[in-house]
Amino acid sequence: MEADPKVPFTDEMNIQDEHNWESGSWSSSRRSNDSNVTLLSRRSSVEQHEDERQKDSDTLFEHGDAALDAQGIADPRLKDYPIPLVAQTVHLRNDDSEPILTFRVWLLSTFWVLAGCSISTVYYFKPFSVRLSGYVVQLCTWKMGQLLASALPTRPFTVLGRRWTLNPGRWSAKEHALVVIAYWGSSYTAYGLGPLSAMELFYGKRLSSPWAITFLVTTQLTGYGLVGLYRHILVRPPSMYYPGILPTVSLFNAMHGDPRQTASSLRVFMAIASAAFVYQWLPSFVFPLLSSLPLLCWVGRGSWEAFVLGSGSLGFGLMDFSLDWNYVAFLSPLFTPLWANANRFVGAALAVWITYPVAYFSDALGSLRFPPMSSETFDTSGGLYNVSRIMTPSLELNQTALELYSTPRWSFSYAMHFFWGFASASAIVTYAVLFHGRTILKALANVWSLDGNTADDIDSEKDPYVKLTSHHARVPQAWYALLLAVCLCLGTIQLYAGDMQLPWWGLQLVVAISALFTLPCGMLFATANVQIGMDYVSEVLAGALFPGRPVAVLTATVYGRQVLEQCLNLASDLKLGFYMKIPEWELLVAQVYGTLLGPFVNWAVMRLIIDTQGAAALLGREGGDGKGQGLGLGQGGGGGGGGGGGGGQQQRAAGAHTTEWNALKTKNFFSSSVIWGVMGPARVFGGGDGSPSSSSPYRWLLPSGFAVGAAAVLLLWLIHKARPAWRVQQWPLHPAIIFHGASLFPVFPTTNLTSSMAAAVASMGVMRRWHPRWFARWNYLLGAGLDCGAQLVQMVLGLAFLVFNRHGQQMVRMPHWWGNDAVAVDQCFPPPDLPSVIMSPM
């Protein structure tokens, strides 16, 4: 990471501005520029600024790392900043003459949203996922912006009385950041596309385009309205710093700083990204054995117990290591705080390496009938659950068939996945109430009294970054409230116009509960880079409220999940804009634009695929009956910047199997609607009237999960009250994160765990503590480069599979050899006495 340490933090602030910053008084006339008019009138000031910057650079270029103190902080004004990671990364420079919402921003953001949404939607209906990496977009946009700055005409023109220019000058960091933020708004396929495709392909319910797009837009934008309510808690305080965006800030610094100071940073980043790109071909395609090195399985070869304990793909992954960055990056080890990853690791290790093996070998809940680490849904005989056997031709529940067949069964590990999920949900709310309740209530009580243009927020009065941008016009609370109200009104109208089976009060209730969870989840995400979502709660809640209405369950689940996630996405992007000194109005416009444009592309591409390919091609020979489909809840690769656990596995699977159309995600949504909507939580977790689930083995999961989560936090709080001198709040211990870490498996392969935690200790532990200068200069660039190179390989492989592996052909396929064994790619061969059920698909 490099935050331009050799440049003084006054090189882009004139002396009067620095004096005003010190005194805390800013002229009300200093407003952020919102058009290119200001830019045209400031040509001379920009040129003068460049001259001053050049003189400062000439003076300081010789000093190198001498500008960094022992903690890697360059500016003495930030030496006491409460978050050293931010002080090391985010500079105190701001140039209000830099262009912001320019023609180049609109052009490039439109291009990347169209390209990214089209690619992600096409692969939504493929057996593996591919999306444009955020780092790839950031890198390409940098050069494209520079090209436009040199090619577009600079002649001004007048439109509706306002002077404009296509080219206001050099490509600025603020423009660059806005393009990336707009792309982030739609970088993933809209979550609501799954229910829409499931409704059409399985339930024969096709929505008209206007109402379908309304559904996608409202599910994506409703959460943005909550940001106005929570931004004074989730964005403004310095303690809410969002660790996941610091690598992006570091890369922006390297791209837009003085070339003589950042040239070395860019060279290092490009070298790392290139090396990662070359190396990643080995574990992803040529030598996949590198992805999983199951030492215990190799040592105990021939023993089925050693196979179960040591396999990282089918078993518990004990002593399994990985040299695949897609797996190593699972915990985002180079920028997630070490204490947070330690909590996740403890929870995962206690679950995967202690609880699950003991329960499995003791046959708890009939574990030996099912694979040890599987997220599929089974029947009582151990076969994959066939939902078509319990459905009538009209896709309603056949109670008699259910009693004759089976209620759903899970592996012990997947049953505990729900237990840990319920525990983490209750723990995070309880923690926020007990430890931060007064602060939250005070902030919420004053939220409407805080003017949109003031910086007097909680814990931010003395924040130098706040003071630096306090003159920027901020979005009033009323605008966020208006956005929320419009989305709720349109969403309610769409429910009835589209016959979504969800009553108006159901939408309001789901949004209200999601809003309740958003604040504690957001506080954790902003400080620990750990996001606990509404997946578990929204599905169970919707199934309990609307039994027998699968479409209503799908609709409520989407709103419950997306309101929370989109609120946190915008809060994170607002913090990025805050670090990049982008006014809130401009950032909100860019974010909403990208998010609005995405659903139109998602729906258009989905319509093209369904209309041209047909349901039979998308659903395979099963013809849409959902036979053999498991829940698939919570599965998926990680995002840019360090998720991606399992990405290499997905690509290798794609290389070994057909890449024809296969709506796996849609099938998973259909199966979820059957389990939680048609059958309902009462039958799954017990207590259903007259159903065989009255003796369900999982009847204890929900109540005990919520109770354990709340009890763990309550115990911690009681210790805090009984022994104040112990400073419990400063302990690196968070029950919600521990439970969340345990819930990650078996959804993700256990291969991820050991190597990812080792990388976290090396980066955020050893290097940050013992080599802070190196950490401050290179750590985030290292992480960004590794992510960029590895993700680019996955994108290239995915596109190659799409283009060449069609119509049953396997033109892109690595020949089998010792490092790419046809039976066991990790050389963890199943012994002859291995129970056949263990080899069932995960």
UniProtKB/Swiss-Prot annotation:
GO terms for biological process: protein transport. Residues 23-36 have a biased composition (Low complexity). Keywords: Glycoprotein, Membrane, Peptide transport, Protein transport, Transmembrane, Transmembrane helix, Transport, Virulence. The lineage of its organism: Eukaryota, Fungi, Dikarya, Ascomycota, Pezizomycotina. It is found in: Membrane. Coiled coil: none annotated. Its main location: membrane. This is Oligopeptide transporter phomP2'. It comes from Diaporthe leptostromiformis (Lupinosis disease fungus). Oligopeptide transporter; part of the gene cluster that mediates the biosynthesis of the phomopsins, a group of hexapeptide mycotoxins which infects lupins and causes lupinosis disease in livestock. Residues 44-58 have a biased composition (Basic and acidic residues). The keyword Membrane applies. It is a multi-pass membrane protein. Residues 629-649 have a biased composition (Gly residues). Glycans are attached at N33, N36, N386, N398, N752. GO terms for molecular function: oligopeptide transmembrane transporter activity. Residues 1-58, 629-657 are annotated as: Disordered. InterPro entries: Oligpept_transpt, OPT. The chain crosses the membrane at residues 105-125, 177-197, 210-230, 268-288, 315-335, 345-365, 415-435, 478-498, 505-525, 585-605, 668-688, 700-720, 731-751, 784-804. GO terms for cellular component: membrane. Belongs to the oligopeptide OPT transporter family.
